[in-house]
Design a protein with these regions (language model features):
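Outer-membrane beta-barrel porins/channels
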Residues: 20-34, 39, 108-511
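Outer-membrane beta-barrel translocator/receptor signature
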Residues: 49-58, 64-137, 142-143, 241
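Short, linear, compositionally biased motifs with a strong N-terminal bias
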Residues: 10-11, 67
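Positively charged n-region of N-terminal signal peptides that target proteins for export
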Residues: 1-4
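Transmembrane beta-strand segments of Gram-negative outer membrane beta-barrel proteins
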Residues: 21-46, 63-81
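Asp/Glu-centered strand-loop micro-motifs enriched in Gly/Pro and often flanked by an aromatic residue
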Residues: 40-55, 230-236
Length: 511
């Protein structure tokens, strides 16, 4: 009866630790180009311009540039094409979705005191999608290393008595898996070894169950071979969103000052499925499937300070500071494993939901300097430069031994990165034509784990008076080396060459 119930209701296991790593940290520290079509048409080079709802998300002084109260809403069609190489295998995957990536309103109040130098004040509220996590790809090829090394590597680094992996009298396999995960002495790493054993991938050197409780040496049931055919499927979904309250003011219509108070929220799901097969007649394990479902939820806070100065009537200078974002993150993990010689009850393990203790993540702050020149009624050109030190990313509490190790890895692997954006606009009466280019340097010192991102944009807009309609097309490319598992015994990675294409439409109204 209990087994039947487990088919419908998962067991909750309070895990001790999940293997957060540098990749997880980088995921929540990067900013994508999101926002209005005008903003995207200029590749986000808006720090000294203002007068656009998404410009306010770069420099909070930008809302005071508005002459009238303003509201906008943006829809985007996001497309990703991944060319994936895994050893001798090559595959192309595509993903497409449509979403609401920006909406907001700014309210402008003019000072009725004509003798005051503070000419107007602005308040705005806006939602911006900072990151879109929707992606999927498939890698396949022949590897000289079997997935058995993933499990054996853990046993070689940590003495795990075989008795820990055994079922107690009357204990179900899913209960043992959950108990190991919630044990302060074992946790996630020993759970992986448990999976490897009950899937038939590894065995203790001493096979005598009456004497092998203290055995800590293990061997593989996969025969050594020159190559193993492997497939790895990756699918992720979700977003990183930001809701901002903005306050800004204008001094003599020459200096604009502003502040943003930001509430952040993360909703991220990742599914990976690994498959391996070999035809060696001496191999006991011939087919292996290993699946992981990760769900991440988080919330955070940050603030921004900004200023825009009119050096002349045509030349503008902008400066802004983004504080670190302080996140509180919760994670849940479901695992599944199988093989041709796995225990018949192995499937019940996928009914266990491992719930891990929440942790804090502090992302790095960012400085942005901007310069823009306005050619009267005929157009403009704008340039933004941003600097962010990714090595300042921190898992917290820093007193935690595991997080201290990961923070050292962050410091060793990540570096300071610059972002360059340039954009221009030509105005032909009611019609505006736009274009831009951006370069985002890799946050990694090696430049290979995640390469530089380079992209361009085109856009147009038409003003119907108080109503404006804008459209933008932007495309960017980036390479990456995706390591399948954070495990030195099985360090295999897939090479990705990704192209991101977006079409955005914005409707904007002056109130």
């Amino acid at each position: 009866m209990k087994k039947l119930l487990l088919l419908f209701v998962g067991i909750l296991s309070t895990g001790i630790i999940y293997a957060q790593d540098v990749t997880d940290a980088v995921r929540y520290t990067q900013d994508e180009i999101q926002g209005t079509a005008r903003y995207r048409g200029l590749s986000g080079a808006f720090g000294a311009l203002g007068g656009d709802m998404s410009a306010v998300s770069i420099n909070p002084a930008g809302s005071a540039i508005f002459n009238n109260s303003h509201i906008s809403l943006s829809l985007s069609n996001n497309n990703i094409k991944n060319d994936v190489q895994y050893f001798n295998g090559f595959n192309t995957s595509k993903e497409s979705n449509i979403d609401l990536n920006q909406t907001g309103a700014a309210f402008v109040f003019y000072n009725r005191n004509s003798n005051s130098d503070w000419t107007k004040f602005a308040f705005s509220a806006a939602y911006d999608k900072v990151q879109n996590y929707n992606n999927d790809w498939l890698a396949y090829g022949t590897n000289s290393t079997s997935i058995d090394r993933y499990f054996l590597d853990i046993t070689e680094k940590q003495a795990i008595p075989f008795g820990v992996l055994k079922l107690q009298p009357g204990e179900y396999i899913e209960e043992a898996y959950a108990d190991i995960g919630s044990s302060p002495a074992y946790g996630y790493p020993v759970q992986q070894v448990f999976l490897g054993y009950w899937a038939g991938i590894i065995d203790p050197v001493n096979l005598d169950n009456s004497t092998n409780d203290d055995e800590t040496n293990y061997f593989s049931n996969t025969a050594p071979a020159d190559s193993y055919y492997q497939e790895f499927y990756y699918a992720s979904s979700g977003y990183n969103g930001k809701f901002s309250l903005n306050f800004a003011t204008s001094y003599k219509d020459r200096l604009y000052l502003g502040i943003n108070l930001n509430s952040h929220f993360i909703n991220y799901d990742k599914f990976t499925s690994f498959y391996e097969t070999n035809n060696d007649p001496d191999s006991l394990t011939k087919n292996i499937v290993f699946e992981n479902w990760l769900s991440t939820y988080g919330s955070g806070f940050s603030f921004q300070l900004g200023a825009i100065a009119k050096i002349t009537n045509d030349l503008r200078l902008g400066l802004s500071y983004n504080s670190p974002t302080w996140y509180r993150i919760e994670e849940e993990l479901i695992q599944g494993i199988d093989s041709n010689i796995a225990d018949p009850d192995i499937g019940y393990i996928s009914n266990i939901i491992n719930i891990y203790p929440s942790y804090n993540l502090q992302t790095p702050g960012k400085f942005t300097g901007s310069l823009a020149y306005i050619f009267g009624e005929y157009g403009l050109i704008s340039f933004d430069y941003s600097l962010k030190d990714y090595s300042n990313t921190k898992f917290k509490p820093t007193s935690d031994a595991y997080f201290a190790t990961q923070n050292n890895a962050i410091n060793n692997q990540l570096t300071t990165a610059s972002t360059y954006k340039i954009g221009g606009e030509i105005r032909l009466k009611q019609l505006s034509l736009r274009g831009g280019y951006r370069l985002e340097e890799s946050p990694y010192k090696n430049g290979n784990t995640l390469g530089d991102l380079k992209g361009y944009s085109l856009g147009l807009g038409y003003s119907f008076g108080s109503f404006k309609l804008d459209m933008a097309f932007d495309q960017a490319k980036q390479t990456a080396e995706y390591r399948l598992y954070n495990n030195s015994g099985f360090p295999s990675s897939a090479s990705l060459d990704s192209r991101f294409t977006n079409v955005t439409v914005t409707a904007a109204f002056n109130l």
